From Swiss-Prot:
It comes from Bos taurus. This is Serpin A3-6. Homodimer. Serine protease inhibitor. Gene3D superfamilies: Alpha-1-antitrypsin, domain 1, Antithrombin, subunit I, domain 2.
Amino acid sequence: MRTERVSPLLALGILVAGLCSRVHCLPENVTPEEQHKVTSVDGHSLASSNTDFAFSLYKQLALKDPNKNVIFSPLSVSIALAFLSLGAHGPTVTEILEGLKFNLTETPETEIHQGFQHLLQTFNQPSNQLQLSVGNAIFVQEELKLLDKFIEDARVLYSSEAFPTNFRDPEAAKSLINDYVKNKTQGKIEELFKDLSPRTELVLVNYVYFKAQWKTRFDPKHTEKTEFHVSDNKTVEVPMMTLDLETPYFRDEELGCTLVELTYTSNDSALFILPDKGKMQDLEAKLTPEMLTRWRNSLQPRRIHELYLPKFSIKSNYELNDTLSQMGIKKIFTDADLSGITGTADLVVSQVVHGAALDVDEEGTEGAAATGIGIERTFLRIIVRVNRPFLIAVVLKDTQSIIFLGKVTNPSEA
């Protein structure tokens, strides 16, 4: 007969942010002498699973409130959960990785971690054209002893920092973690954790910081207040940017949507997807990795004589416990085996929180966001009006990773 136990708690903090500031790279690259070698596994081999997870998580978040903005980093959530799985055993690790859409008969657990290691190394390469930093941190109760193997795997595979923390003083612990987050996001996310239990033993944090400039920038002198149609009976005024450029474009008659891709100076890109009026929920239901591949293969350079895109800044803060449970990741909250972290099997996850912030302006994308596109044709002229709800996917070219995914329903709401 099983007896009830009061388990120590573990929390996951996942955050994404970006703004016009300098960023700092993570710890140095892994040397050839490291215990864990990077194999032929690379970001592309993870792209399909990560994209599948991204769309599955998006659908869950969008269903909770179809009329709200959605912004999150699927890559950040994936990295945090994969990081957690380093310390999981048995059905717990299987549930986490299968929940992340990995087929463990095709991709062994070791290769998954090596793939994320490769992604982190790729993301944190210095660049003059892109500010991108991805990192992990462990905040651990002062007297808690972590297993040496977990510490080493966390450092080598996930570039993780570690900080002793007194969770028995939850306010001080919360301040320590939130200050770390605020510093790493240059003040963009100020309060990732709103509260912590004094029973917390461990907090894992993942962050993404992103800043990129458009290859063809908008002229601020041409930005004007314009109507944005939130719904049939609600209209708001937003600052609307405008531009004349040649850029990849595709009209999908089958799904009833229009796509425009804007490229950053780094050659990464933001894909804006505008469903026809009344088609948003139909389109959301059909989002799959295969659909994204079809869209990207169908994009062709076209001259857009007038592109109108709203300038906006939005934030989000999600508690993902219920959402992840609905996606099949349940054991971590109830009867987890996380004995690979401390050597005992009495840790459970108390909360998974995710914060995101996105600014889009004339210079480029800061963080992540969503934008949309409406199309008018007058003979050979193409006019793209982003004046109703739309989707956005920010994709990193080198790995085809979706670093941000979202929906902008109302650009005037922060």
